[in-house]
């Protein structure tokens, strides 16, 4: 690492004074730690002669007086215009021995044949090198003159000086370098052999003294400073130089650091009633909550209070989360080989790359080796990594918040703080790092839900000063807690009761809280029927959009033994409106063309009224208007009756078809056989089943008893031809279904005239007849 050759003026090259410091003999250390000194040859002048001045100076036994030194320097400075060749004066140490240098002057001849007079303080070693005492080279620049150089033309070849590289940061700022100082504040340390390089005019180098607390933004490198490949006087000192420089790391979100020597919490005016968060770090390096959740009653009284975090350590954990929000900034001590992690689980960032041009003066001081060409430190998150950290609250208060940090030897370095810290009080963070290598890991969550870790490695950092964390003003965390949720529960008696469930809400500082009102009891509702004692009268109301209520009738599930003293009323089930108790269906005049033209009757006036379909080619005849209307809907394709069962949606032209279809969903079998108690969904299926019993017993039609009950205006007469309801006499004798009745002297006419006969229901249908 040499600088380019620069011309040296003759008036700037003065003769070096010899300072013997009161000694006539000098020691040269040569055990490998010998420090290199420099020598310069003064240009010769004819008037007065510099050799005469040197001979007069060296003839004295003691050190030269200050007056003589000044005279010699003045004489050398006025010797402009004279020409002379400088010999190859080289500085080197003889290894593994001490040499005694005599103070007598010497005159030797170099390789070019020039006569050079050596001062009394210097000597010639066995290798033919000139050695000058180190006391005479204080506060002088070190350079060497190669053999055969000519100073008359104003140039000096192979001048090597200032081996510190010129390093600048990304924004053009000057690099600040620091080196460990020698013990005696001299240019060369005799004990450690360190070479102290004199800085140039455009560099700022702290060359001596321990790192002072008054010097800001300076990083001191401990240990020996070795210059690699520096040639001084023909000798080389190989080694690797640790150059400490300011390298921009690229902390996003305008994050800077400012040092804090001590945190005086008493002068910050902190309150005594603040909440305390108790958190811990598990073995995986995640922040966990070790306290219990606070209920809503305590949160209402502690509105506006601050949160003080407390981070504890597990037995096997060497990782540390450094809190970065304004309410959790405390001094932290980080050991070498420890991992500094940022918990950003609550943030979603977009992967990207931050270039050096986007950095805004945020630096972390690192050490870069000479053998390392370039170290690109990249941050793969375009958005700020640290903005707001979600904190868990704990109900248990603590008097002190302590941050501890785990080390491989299970040694704990802790920094104590007082009982609470407000976010307005602490705005700074101090990171004290021991020498070594440490990692910075930032955890981010991608939009797809994957957790990624970004790792940054920094080597050789001993101390970080002038660092300040400033939180980004955007992206406040919004909490939407549910304060009270009312759940509906069904009691044993069927009543719906509301049970409020209280949920705790976290009152965190600087967070907007959105309150959700209480939810009323809705969803499942049980509607009680008129007769609460009968489970068959319970109506189940389905959720929207199904507004129709289903009623499970009790007579559809009763056995035949429960049908004694039953009054049977046959109604028109084909009507458009369902039957409601206490209301009668009004008959509507038929509006078909045949009924209007024929005056409402068929061709035969004495017979029952008939309704003939007026569609050409059909000609079907119906005895009821409802049947004709249903038939006309079949012609037009209109199907107004829709099954509202889930995922069904079938449509029908007649209501009885819809009711029959519903029984396929519910599995209801309302038609019961009186012989074997089998159940059927349809009445025609039951009629066919009854015929099987009749055929087995050989029942003839003459032994069948048909009866009618109370032939009133509201009841329909039941006859033997094409009737819809079959009644059997069960008063006298034993009757099994429709069978032979043993009346013991009672005629069939007497049975028919008896109006108090208990009846047994065999089949119920308004429009279906038995075959």
Curated annotation (Swiss-Prot):
Q: List the disulfide bonds.
A: none
The UniProt annotation puts the region (Transactivation domain (Gln-rich)) at 129-228, 341-489
N6-acetyllysine-modified residues are 541
One of the GO biological process terms? monocyte differentiation
What spans are recorded as compositionally biased (Low complexity)? 34-47
C2H2-type Zn finger ranges: 611-635, 641-665, 671-693
Q: Where is this cross-link: Glycyl lysine isopeptide (Lys-Gly) (interchain with G-Cter in SUMO)?
A: 109, 541
Where can this protein be found? Nucleus; Nucleus, PML body
Identify the GO cellular component terms for this protein: cytosol; PML body; transcription repressor complex
In terms of SMART domains, this protein maps to:
ZnF_C2H2
User: Annotated region Disordered: where?
Assistant: 1-47, 60-79
A Pfam family it matches: zf-C2H2
Share the domain note from the entry.
The 9aaTAD motif is a transactivation domain present in a large number of yeast and animal transcription factors.
UniProt lists the family membership as follows: Belongs to the Sp1 C2H2-type zinc-finger protein family.
Q: What is this protein called?
A: Transcription factor Sp3
The organism that produces this protein has a lineage beginning with: Eukaryota, Metazoa, Chordata, Craniata, Vertebrata
């Amino acid at each position: 690492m040499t600088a380019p050759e620069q011309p040296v003026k003759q008036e700037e090259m003065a003769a070096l004074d010899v300072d013997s410091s009161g000694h006539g003999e000098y020691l040269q250390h040569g055990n490998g730690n010998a420090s290199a000194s420099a020598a310069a040859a003064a240009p010769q002048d004819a008037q007065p002669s510099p050799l005469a001045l040197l001979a007069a100076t060296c003839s004295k036994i003691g050190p030269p007086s200050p007056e003589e030194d000044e005279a010699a320097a003045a004489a050398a400075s006025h010797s402009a215009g004279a020409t002379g060749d400088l010999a190859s004066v080289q500085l080197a140490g003889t290894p593994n021995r001490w040499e005694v240098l005599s103070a007598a002057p010497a005159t030797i001849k170099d390789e070019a044949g020039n006569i050079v007079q050596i001062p009394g303080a210097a000597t010639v070693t066995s290798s033919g090198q000139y050695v000058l005492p180190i006391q005479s080279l204080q506060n002088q620049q070190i350079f060497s003159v190669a053999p055969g150089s000519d100073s008359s033309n104003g140039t000096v070849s192979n001048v090597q000086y200032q081996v510190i590289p010129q390093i600048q940061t990304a924004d053009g700022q000057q690099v600040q370098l620091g080196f460990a100082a020698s013990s005696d504040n001299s240019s060369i340390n005799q004990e450690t052999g360190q070479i102290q390089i004199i800085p140039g005019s455009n560099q700022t180098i702290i060359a001596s003294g321990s790192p002072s607390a008054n010097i800001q933004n300076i990083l001191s490198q401990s240990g020996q400073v070795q210059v690699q490949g520096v040639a001084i006087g023909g000798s080389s000192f190989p080694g690797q130089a640790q150059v400490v420089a300011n390298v921009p790391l690229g902390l996003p979100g305008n994050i800077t650091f400012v040092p804090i020597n001590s945190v005086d919490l008493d002068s910050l005016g902190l309150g005594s009633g603040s909440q305390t968060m108790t958190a811990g770090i598990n073995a995986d390096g995640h922040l966990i909550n070790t306290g219990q959740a606070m209920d809503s009653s305590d949160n209402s009284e502690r509105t506006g209070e601050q949160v003080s975090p407390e981070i504890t350590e597990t037995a096997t954990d060497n990782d540390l989360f450094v809190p970065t929000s304004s309410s959790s900034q405390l001094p932290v001590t980080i050991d070498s080989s420890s991992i500094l992690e940022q918990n950003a689980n609550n943030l979603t960032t977009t992967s990207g790359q931050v270039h050096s041009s986007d950095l805004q003066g945020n630096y972390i001081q690192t050490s870069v080796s000479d053998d390392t060409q370039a170290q690109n430190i990249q941050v793969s998150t375009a958005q700020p990594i640290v903005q707001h950290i979600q904190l868990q609250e704990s109900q248990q208060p603590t008097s002190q918040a302590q941050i501890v940090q785990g080390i491989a030897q299970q040694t704990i370095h802790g920094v104590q703080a007082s009982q609470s810290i407000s976010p307005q009080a602490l705005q700074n963070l101090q990171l004290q790092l021991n020498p070594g290598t440490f990692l910075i890991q930032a955890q981010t969550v991608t939009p797809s839900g994957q957790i990624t870790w970004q790792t940054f490695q920094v080597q050789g950092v001993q101390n970080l000063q002038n660092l300040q964390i400033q939180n980004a003003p955007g992206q406040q965390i919004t909490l939407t807690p549910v304060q009270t949720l009312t759940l509906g529960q069904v009691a044993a008696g069927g009543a719906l009761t509301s049970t409020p469930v209280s949920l705790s809400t976290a009152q965190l500082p600087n967070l907007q809280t959105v309150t959700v009102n209480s939810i009323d009891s809705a969803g499942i509702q049980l509607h009680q029927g008129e007769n609460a004692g009968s489970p068959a009268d319970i109506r189940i109301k389905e959720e929207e959009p199904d507004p129709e209520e289903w009623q499970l009738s009790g007579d559809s599930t009763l056995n035949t033994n429960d049908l004694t003293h039953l009054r049977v009323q046959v109604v028109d089930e084909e009507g458009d409106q369902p039957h409601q108790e206490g209301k009668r269906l009004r008959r509507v005049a038929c509006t078909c063309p045949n009924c209007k033209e024929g005056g409402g009757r068929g061709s035969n006036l004495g017979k029952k009224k008939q309704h003939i379909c007026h569609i050409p080619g059909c000609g079907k005849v119906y005895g009821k208007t409802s049947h004709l209307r249903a038939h006309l809907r079949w012609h037009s394709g209109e199907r107004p009756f829709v099954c509202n069962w889930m995922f069904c949606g079938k449509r029908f032209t007649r209501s009885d078809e819809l009711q029959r279809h519903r029984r396929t969903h519910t599995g209801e079998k309302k038609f019961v056989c009186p012989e074997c108690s089998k159940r059927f969904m349809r009445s025609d299926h039951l009629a066919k089943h009854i015929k099987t019993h009749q055929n087995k017993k050989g029942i003839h039609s003459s032994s069948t008893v048909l009866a009618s009950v109370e032939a009133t205006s509201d009841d329909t007469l039941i006859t033997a031809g094409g009737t819809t309801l079959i009644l059997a006499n069960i008063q006298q004798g034993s009757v099994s279904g429709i069978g032979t009745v043993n009346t013991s002297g009672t005629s069939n006419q007497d049975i028919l005239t008896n109006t108090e006969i208990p009846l047994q229901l065999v089949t119920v249908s308004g429009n279906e007849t038995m075959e």
